[in-house]
Amino acid sequence: MARLRVAVLAGGRSSEHDISLASARSVLESLDPAEYDVVTVAIGRDGRWELGSGGGSVAETLPIPAASAPATLGAVDVVLPILHGPFGEDGTVQGLLELAGVAYVGAGVAASALCMDKDLFKKVLRDSGLPVARHVALRVGDAIDNPFGYPCFVKPARLGSSVGISKVHDDGELGPAVELAFRHDEKVLIEEFLDGIEVEVGVLGNFEPVASLPGQIVPLGHEWYDFASKYDEGGMDLVIPPDLPAAVIEQVQRAAVEAFRVTECEGMARVDCFVVGGSRVVVNELNTIPGFTATSVYAKLFDASGVPYEELLRRLIALALERQERRSKLQY
């Protein structure tokens, strides 16, 4: 049986460039060479695309030297975009792949763009009857008004990994927090603080998505689940499953799958929720390309649910090919 040729996209222009490379290395190490002919395409911080020459070898492939000569990728069966943040998770690369007619893993153009924008995402979920935190959106020049009291959160609308996010405790911290967020985006959210347990759920599938066991996020040595607690070794504990009643765990899983469906996601997502007051589930965010190392939350959640990392990759590639086959029959 011929091997599938898989192109792994890594890097990107966002502040999550290094996180993307770490995820891609794990993918390269885990794709079975007996099944897949893997090539790597790294996108530099300057937007330059470089083709790896190591045939998928981690040591030879990443990072790709900036002075690499132009090269032709050739035909591929499926693209695995392991890109986080703007210019990778926001529908831009997905649009390019759609134009090229190439199968790719993960959400499509519209779902990627929608879920990247925390403001629009919350509005769509709220209109669909799913509970979300209250928020207001600011553009440059808008008056800064916090209607929720303190503490609250200030966030760039379209960035991940908690980059540019501040937990604000009083009026004196609000202005600088908004200024920081505007360094990263042209739209900023002020969001109410939810005093609850933070849980995350993996979702896998196309038209029939399934949820993993949830995992509770417990920051260690940090006031909240910020960038440092996400990526510092020992920055947080992940408790799978959370110490919650079975009915609440099922409610979290249903909310995650419904958020996936409402936003018309495909392939994969990690849905972040809060459980407030022991039983009220609030959807916070949906990540269409979650961190993807073997020790990332998404992979751990499915491993605990009986889907090991290598099998998870295999299923995602199969889902991408299934979607491409389905769409190839459409008449435009």
Question: What name fits each language-model region?
Answer:
Residues 38, 103-104, 132, 152, ...:
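Hydrophobic beta-strand scaffold residues
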Residues 1-110, 114-116, 120, 127, ...:
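ATP-binding N-terminal substructure of ATP-dependent carboxylate-amine bond-forming enzymes
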Residues 169-254, 275-282:
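Phosphate-binding site of ATP-dependent enzymes
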